[in-house]
């Protein structure tokens, strides 16, 4: 695997004389190291150069913030959770619980396959879509009714934590 050349947002080679250089240290200070690293991984398709812009880095900083907020939500809603709750059998789980665990398994398979083939951009894309669109936008919202008065609060806490931990493990190589 040979890494790509990083170009500006117009596809031009970065050059000090052209004045189109994006200083990675400045971007790390402004948006965070994780956001810059994930941006580069997300756009590093095999055989293609990376068109980098500050807006793209900012977008992945927003992704990092979304994950941070999801983590805070999960951790703030673990009151009374002692970590001993075992997952219920599949037929006893709610539809939302079965759905998110199914999507987690599919995402895990997709990420592992992409990493084995050195397709880091595909792995990053799968992780991004799962965390943003499915875990944060859907499952966290669906879980609120279970957490705030539902009969399966402990099961919901367990699944929230399990999926969050899995997401963080997905992100570890990035």
Predicted regions and their residues:
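Short secondary-structure boundary/capping segments
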Residues: 15-22, 54-57
